[in-house]
Amino acid sequence: MSPVSSAAAADGATGAHAMLAAMRNAGLNPDDVQYLNAHGTSTPLGDANETAAVKAAFGDHAGRLAVNSTKSMHGHLLGAAGGVEALITVLAIHHQVSPPTINLVNPDPACDLDYVPNAAREMRIEAAMSNSFGFGGTNGTLAFRRLR
């Protein structure tokens, strides 16, 4: 483990791996994805690590993604969090709206992506992903596409 790892937070490599695997399995390239529902538990270490993972997985496209954490609205639902966030991601595609990350006033400088602060955003969403990250780097990412 790296110095920034612990039993509760891996260093971000496993999160990047989960996102890359989801894109590969779905036949998506990073620039095909417009929206990411991040795990985003609002912890300094976890959010910085997830930001680093998003940058590693999406490269230059990371700065063009709409990234949010809907946990800012519904809280951490433990085992149900991944399912609820996957449903929210599908609804974002259906309605073509990225939900906001509410109460984002003073973001950590290490968290420098477009987190859709405080207000929903109408946008084109053809493909989206949802992260569900667990203790010690037990991570899952689902990828979804708009039906054509």
Predicted ranges, named:
Residues 1-148:
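Conserved "HGTGT" condensation-loop signature of ketosynthase/thiolase-family condensing enzymes
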